[in-house]
């Protein structure tokens, strides 16, 4: 570590060391003020420091993870997936979808000024704007949903905060909070996977019993009969689970289920799809 004394001894002097630091602070403060945004406590937002790209006005709450803005844009919350409401046929809505929407409505109201922070990809395939959403009080809406069990963590793109979102989801699952109290959403044991799960996105729980390298994949084998395929080209991103200390550990894997060569399997593309249960 370079101390202020060392800087002074080197001839730079503390005056010159502090000057650029203070200037950078002032520039940062000025950029926030130019957006009219107040800084929220970092204690409130566990995952993402409060910062924003744009101020917007809320017009409508569509469901637990989608909002409509006054300017007509649809906002899809990055990194979470709440139960879907079928607006055309309400009876087909997913379990706990109305509760998730009601929770968002308890945090926001029409006309509220919100702050958005955009991810690396601006739009999803449906033309919705992808964003982290901060309430008027500076709270991250995604974090609130995950903590209370009104949404699950789900990564569709490069998401720098996925590990924090995964921890929040795991805590909610452990407490059977919100949607996690229902079998519809709870991770399924490998022994109960059946035809009804084919080609559906599921959470599957099992114990790592072996590893296997075959073809283009490294296979994580759960309970001796369920295979999780990790592309060898991207295996470096999965170092936490591709380790000997993962053997005999319980994991939860999420993804679309396939049945091939008489084996149930999930092919993963992002490390967020595999989580160690009760990590040390």
Language-model features and meaning:
Residues 1-5, 15, 24:
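Positively charged n-region of N-terminal signal peptides that target proteins for export
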Residues 2-3, 17, 36-280:
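Small beta-barrel nucleic-acid-binding modules, primarily SNase/OB-fold domains
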Residues 7-10:
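Short hydrophobic targeting helices and cationic amphipathic motifs
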Residues 12-15, 30, 71:
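A ubiquitous, low-specificity "background" feature that marks scattered single residues
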Residues 20-36:
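Bacterial N-terminal signal peptides
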């Amino acid at each position: 570590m370079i101390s202020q004394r060392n800087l002074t001894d080197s001839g730079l002097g503390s005056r010159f060391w502090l000057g650029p630091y203070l200037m950078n602070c002032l520039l940062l403060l000025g950029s926030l003020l130019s957006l009219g945004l107040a800084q929220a406590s970092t204690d409130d937002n566990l995952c993402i420091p409060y910062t924003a790209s744009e101020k917007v006005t809320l017009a409508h709450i569509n469901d637990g993870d989608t909002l409509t803005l006054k300017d007509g844009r649809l906002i899809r919350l990055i990194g979470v997936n709440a139960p879907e409401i079928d607006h055309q046929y309400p009876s087909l809505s997913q379990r706990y979808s109305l509760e998730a929407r009601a929770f968002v409505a308890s945090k926001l109201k029409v006309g509220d000024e919100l702050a958005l922070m955009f991810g690396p990809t601006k739009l999803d395939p449906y033309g919705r704007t992808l964003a982290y959403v901060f309430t008027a009080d500076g709270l991250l809406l995604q974090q609130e949903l995950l903590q209370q069990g009104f949404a699950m963590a789900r990564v569709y793109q490069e998401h720098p905060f996925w590990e924090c979102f995964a921890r929040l989801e795991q805590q909610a699952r452990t407490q059977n909070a919100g949607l996690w109290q229902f079998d519809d959403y709870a991770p399924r044991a490998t022994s109960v996977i059946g035809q009804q799960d084919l080609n559906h996105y599921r959470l599957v729980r099992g114990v790592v019993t072996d590893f296997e390298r075959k073809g283009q994949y490294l296979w994580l084998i759960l309970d001796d009969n369920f295979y999780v395929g990790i592309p060898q080209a991207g295996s470096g991103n999965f170092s936490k689970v591709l380790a000997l200390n993962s053997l005999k550990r319980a994991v939860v894997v999420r993804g679309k289920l396939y049945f091939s060569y008489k084996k149930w399997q999930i092919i993963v593309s992002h490390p967020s799809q595999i989580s160690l249960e009760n990590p040390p």
